[in-house]
Protein backbone atom coordinates (compact mmCIF):
# COMPACT_ATOMS: atom_id res chain seq x y z
CA UNK A 1 0.00 0.00 0.00
CA UNK A 2 1.23 3.49 -0.73
CA UNK A 3 1.69 6.06 2.02
CA UNK A 4 -1.25 8.07 0.71
CA UNK A 5 -3.48 4.96 0.73
CA UNK A 6 -2.43 4.09 4.29
CA UNK A 7 -3.13 7.66 5.37
CA UNK A 8 -6.58 7.52 3.74
CA UNK A 9 -7.43 4.25 5.52
CA UNK A 10 -6.26 5.63 8.87
CA UNK A 11 -8.30 8.79 8.32
CA UNK A 12 -11.40 6.74 7.46
CA UNK A 13 -10.99 4.57 10.56
CA UNK A 14 -10.46 7.64 12.75
CA UNK A 15 -13.58 9.27 11.34
CA UNK A 16 -15.63 6.10 11.89
CA UNK A 17 -14.42 5.82 15.49
CA UNK A 18 -15.16 9.48 16.16
CA UNK A 19 -18.75 9.04 14.96
CA UNK A 20 -19.35 5.78 16.84
CA UNK A 21 -21.68 6.11 19.83
CA UNK A 22 -19.79 6.35 23.09
CA UNK A 23 -20.24 3.60 25.63
CA UNK A 24 -22.48 4.74 28.43
CA UNK A 25 -20.59 5.32 31.62
CA UNK A 26 -21.71 3.77 34.86
CA UNK A 27 -23.34 6.13 37.35
CA UNK A 28 -21.37 6.67 40.53
CA UNK A 29 -23.52 5.54 43.44
CA UNK A 30 -20.80 5.65 46.12
CA UNK A 31 -17.49 7.48 45.74
CA UNK A 32 -14.17 6.13 46.99
CA UNK A 33 -14.01 9.00 49.52
CA UNK A 34 -17.45 8.07 50.89
CA UNK A 35 -16.47 4.41 51.10
CA UNK A 36 -13.53 5.26 53.37
CA UNK A 37 -15.74 7.05 55.91
CA UNK A 38 -16.09 5.15 59.20
CA UNK A 39 -19.13 3.00 59.90
CA UNK A 40 -21.66 4.55 62.28
CA UNK A 41 -21.29 3.51 65.91
CA UNK A 42 -24.90 2.32 66.18
CA UNK A 43 -25.05 0.19 63.00
CA UNK A 44 -26.23 -2.83 65.00
CA UNK A 45 -29.16 -0.89 66.46
CA UNK A 46 -31.11 -0.42 63.24
CA UNK A 47 -34.77 -1.09 63.92
CA UNK A 48 -37.02 -1.99 61.03
CA UNK A 49 -40.07 -3.47 62.76
CA UNK A 50 -43.26 -1.52 63.26
CA UNK A 51 -46.77 -2.14 64.55
CA UNK A 52 -48.38 -1.56 61.17
CA UNK A 53 -47.46 -3.00 57.83
CA UNK A 54 -45.63 -0.37 55.85
CA UNK A 55 -44.16 -0.94 52.41
CA UNK A 56 -41.53 -3.67 52.13
CA UNK A 57 -38.13 -2.99 50.59
CA UNK A 58 -36.52 -5.94 48.77
CA UNK A 59 -33.05 -6.11 47.26
CA UNK A 60 -33.29 -7.83 43.87
CA UNK A 61 -29.91 -7.12 42.27
CA UNK A 62 -27.17 -7.72 43.04
CA UNK A 63 -28.44 -10.95 44.59
CA UNK A 64 -28.25 -10.49 48.38
CA UNK A 65 -27.58 -14.23 48.77
CA UNK A 66 -24.73 -14.15 46.25
CA UNK A 67 -21.01 -13.92 46.88
CA UNK A 68 -20.70 -10.36 45.63
CA UNK A 69 -20.73 -8.39 42.41
CA UNK A 70 -18.14 -6.67 40.26
CA UNK A 71 -18.68 -2.96 39.72
CA UNK A 72 -20.42 -1.62 37.74
CA UNK A 73 -23.48 -3.76 38.37
CA UNK A 74 -27.24 -3.38 37.95
CA UNK A 75 -28.90 -2.18 41.15
CA UNK A 76 -32.54 -3.17 41.54
CA UNK A 77 -34.59 -2.61 44.69
CA UNK A 78 -38.29 -3.47 44.78
CA UNK A 79 -41.01 -1.70 46.81
CA UNK A 80 -44.01 -3.77 47.85
CA UNK A 81 -46.97 -1.78 49.17
CA UNK A 82 -49.73 -3.54 51.13
CA UNK A 83 -53.53 -3.24 51.46
CA UNK A 84 -54.23 -1.40 48.19
CA UNK A 85 -51.79 1.41 48.96
CA UNK A 86 -49.07 2.92 46.81
CA UNK A 87 -45.57 4.14 47.61
CA UNK A 88 -45.30 7.93 47.81
CA UNK A 89 -42.37 8.76 45.51
CA UNK A 90 -41.36 11.94 47.36
CA UNK A 91 -41.00 9.91 50.56
CA UNK A 92 -38.22 7.65 49.28
CA UNK A 93 -34.92 8.34 51.01
CA UNK A 94 -31.73 6.36 50.36
CA UNK A 95 -28.93 6.71 52.91
CA UNK A 96 -25.41 5.29 52.83
CA UNK A 97 -24.77 4.19 56.41
CA UNK A 98 -21.50 5.89 57.28
CA UNK A 99 -20.43 8.46 59.84
CA UNK A 100 -21.55 10.99 58.80
CA UNK A 101 -24.33 9.39 56.74
CA UNK A 102 -24.47 10.17 53.02
CA UNK A 103 -27.80 10.95 51.32
CA UNK A 104 -27.80 9.03 48.03
CA UNK A 105 -31.35 10.08 47.12
CA UNK A 106 -30.38 12.89 44.71
CA UNK A 107 -28.13 10.50 42.75
CA UNK A 108 -30.95 7.97 42.44
CA UNK A 109 -33.92 10.35 41.97
CA UNK A 110 -34.31 9.69 38.24
CA UNK A 111 -34.23 5.92 38.85
CA UNK A 112 -36.95 5.82 41.54
CA UNK A 113 -40.48 4.68 40.63
CA UNK A 114 -43.46 3.50 42.65
CA UNK A 115 -42.21 -0.05 42.04
CA UNK A 116 -38.67 0.54 43.28
CA UNK A 117 -35.21 1.65 42.22
CA UNK A 118 -33.64 0.52 38.96
CA UNK A 119 -30.11 1.72 38.19
CA UNK A 120 -28.61 -0.09 35.21
CA UNK A 121 -24.92 0.40 36.04
CA UNK A 122 -24.04 1.37 39.61
CA UNK A 123 -20.40 2.28 40.15
CA UNK A 124 -19.38 1.32 43.70
CA UNK A 125 -15.88 0.81 45.19
CA UNK A 126 -14.91 -2.69 46.39
CA UNK A 127 -16.03 -3.58 49.91
CA UNK A 128 -19.22 -4.09 51.87
CA UNK A 129 -21.65 -1.19 51.83
CA UNK A 130 -24.83 -0.84 53.91
CA UNK A 131 -27.62 1.33 52.53
CA UNK A 132 -30.90 2.16 54.26
CA UNK A 133 -33.99 2.74 52.11
CA UNK A 134 -36.98 4.46 53.75
CA UNK A 135 -40.39 4.62 52.02
CA UNK A 136 -43.89 5.70 53.02
CA UNK A 137 -47.18 4.49 51.58
CA UNK A 138 -50.34 6.45 50.74
CA UNK A 139 -51.73 5.73 54.23
CA UNK A 140 -48.64 7.21 55.91
CA UNK A 141 -47.12 3.91 57.01
CA UNK A 142 -43.34 3.74 56.87
CA UNK A 143 -41.20 0.88 55.63
CA UNK A 144 -37.44 0.58 55.94
CA UNK A 145 -35.06 -1.86 54.34
CA UNK A 146 -31.34 -2.41 54.61
CA UNK A 147 -29.53 -3.19 51.37
CA UNK A 148 -26.12 -4.82 51.66
CA UNK A 149 -23.84 -4.40 48.67
CA UNK A 150 -20.84 -6.73 48.59
CA UNK A 151 -18.58 -5.44 45.85
CA UNK A 152 -15.66 -7.55 44.64
CA UNK A 153 -12.28 -6.00 43.77
Annotate each predicted stretch with a short phrase:
Residues 121-128:
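Surface-exposed, short loops/turns at beta-strand junctions within beta-sandwich domains
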Residues 82-93:
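Solvent-exposed loop/turn segments flanking beta-strands in beta-repeat/beta-sandwich domains
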Residues 148-153:
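Short beta-strand edge segments in extracellular beta-sheet folds
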Residues 23-73:
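Short, compositionally biased P/S/T/A/G/V-rich stretches that sit at domain boundaries
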Residues 110-118:
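Aromatic sugar-binding surface patches on proteins
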Residues 74-83:
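Short edge beta-strand/loop segments characteristic of extracellular beta-sandwich folds
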Amino acid sequence: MHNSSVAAVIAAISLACANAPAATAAEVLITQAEATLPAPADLGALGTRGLTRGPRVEQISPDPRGTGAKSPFPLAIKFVAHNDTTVVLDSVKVTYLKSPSVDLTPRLKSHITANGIDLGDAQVPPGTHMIRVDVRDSQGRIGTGIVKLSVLP
